[in-house]
């Protein structure tokens, strides 16, 4: 179905999608049709999602305190009665659940585990409640991203992926619920095992010793080098770290493969290529059938783009999905775009989305619905989820870059709370990234050097502080 009044941008997107669907194969065709249906009816889908969330959580304590009952499933009542919330606002409720209170506090559906967010609150990791059907919801959206990539990069299903994936340790809350990173939960899921098409054995991925896990995954990837069609990790930093691990350990890896008496056609090229000392395009030299890299290169991960381009010999870098501990957000419908041009199309069936314009007061009346954001403006994303997060400030700042049908497309800008400061100044991660790029261009490139990665901290040892708002620490490569 197509929505009325779709812009010329939407019309162009429909035309592009039609050509993609003509080239697609089942079941990718059905997934592409679902994307078109969802993005053409954003407002109606969002209204349905909110009604579902409010209806199923009507008996939850949190919504009851807001003054909602089972009949209050419309947007107007929701906007009038439910306040914007931070993690500190929800923390007392989350703590009760973590301590074993099984009453319907945030959701009437049982909380089965917590995803630990990378953000912190008062030095503690944030705990995001997860209900039974959340993983299935994420699996559907992941399959949509796979279908989009299959059309742009055909034939990926005929080989394997060398993905450096690392599980983290889980903990138990006082009430006995598991608390772990979202990705660790994914790696342990039955869906992940069913859809498995990677060179790394599950035991290596789930190994909590990062060094042993890296060694085993690299070893298996080298042994299956002619089966690899894509190379990646979740974040760009992890893939760069894997290649640097190979630089330091290639001789031992080659020796282990040789000792294992594998086919010389597998072992010899790895040894020869790594011993040359030239690591330009090492990915395609070791894994010659690789079609793309698959990593997140948005936000602070953008610093690794030049390094990945160097190691891969210019392979396409795909950032396919945008998700967090709170929920799944959207897909990159142009996965082969330049890494600096990545935008994500929000999928309206995953949660109820609202947006706070950057610079405006944190007030419920200032929130803008998904279908009503403006092109070119920056917003902080606010979500209402099936698990009981209501009008929750995620902390991500996004910029609207266009539309696919009626669905807004967003570029990730920065985390709202990530700042460096000496006095009254405030330098966010996007500003720091631009400063480092300018310095690298002016000072390093003329000398044939480049930045592999960097970090920074506020420099307050001297008074007054440095004119620069941060003291950066750079790792350089010749």
UniProtKB/Swiss-Prot annotation:
GO biological process, one term: response to light stimulus
InterPro entries the record matches: GH3, GH3_M
The entry's keywords: Ligase
Gene Ontology MF: a single term: acid-amino acid ligase activity
Transmembrane portions of the chain: none
Keyword Isomerase: no
First-tier enzyme category under EC: ligase
EC number, as in UniProt: 6.3.2.-
Keyword Glycosyltransferase: no
GO cellular component labels: cytoplasm
Pfam family membership, one: GH3_M
Family membership noted in the UniProt record: Belongs to the IAA-amido conjugating enzyme family.
Protein function: May catalyze the synthesis of indole-3-acetic acid (IAA)-amino acid conjugates, providing a mechanism for the plant to cope with the presence of excess auxin.
Protein name per Swiss-Prot or TrEMBL: Putative indole-3-acetic acid-amido synthetase GH3.10
Gene from which this protein is expressed: GH3.10
